[in-house]
């Protein structure tokens, strides 16, 4: 087997490694606003496989899940209903936030592209987390753990990302 030389990172590459995970808050806001503004888009977007965990921002995850839940229960998704669900949430001012979401909603013609971007960015975050887990496991490798175990765990994680998104 041919011996390969180790990869040596310079300080800039190490600093780049500490950057923020990929996300697009504007896309998340535009999608949520579009779903509130036009409830007919909800089924179309949920059929794409978009789930709450695909959103980067935690309260966007909550909002999306409530929208899907309300829609599945046959309820109209409106600012008024959402506001009442989130009025005890101290994280944001639900009144102005929901109005802002609707005001900045994506056009229904590009909504699928916006949803796909949110999904793709989520996949990238999951891949980065898997790579970081692999890196940590590789550095923490002990004599009682085989390299093949780490490879197998990583393969399983990648397969799950591929299957579940």
Please place each PLM-identified region on the residue numbering.
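Noncatalytic partner-interaction/assembly domains of nucleic-acid and motor enzyme complexes
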Residues: 1-123
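Short, exposed beta-strand "edge-strand" segments with a Pro/Gly-rich flavor and a Y/T-containing core
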Residues: 19-20, 73-77, 142-145, 160-165
